[in-house]
């Protein structure tokens, strides 16, 4: 996915998990309850990074599931997702 770059855990909740490359050029947003995952690269990763930082600034007290759920549902990132392999 990221040409050998490690992906580290950035945010983790009961419903959602977010991983990112060190340079934030790639993100993996996962819905744990729905078993879907969105791989975001290039321009999609840049847009997601800006949206994620904006949600964090606007709602600093939100827990990971609130922030990531907002991006998943209302940010439209669920449309980038595919069902996880079994």
Predicted regions and their residues:
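A short, structured beta-strand/loop element
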Residues: 19-47
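Short, charged/polar N-terminal "headpieces" of proteins
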Residues: 1-23
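Mixed-charge, Lys/Arg-enriched low-complexity segments
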Residues: 41-86
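Intrinsic-disorder/low-complexity peptide segments enriched for small residues
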Residues: 7-8, 38, 66
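General secondary-structure edge motif
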Residues: 9-10, 32, 51
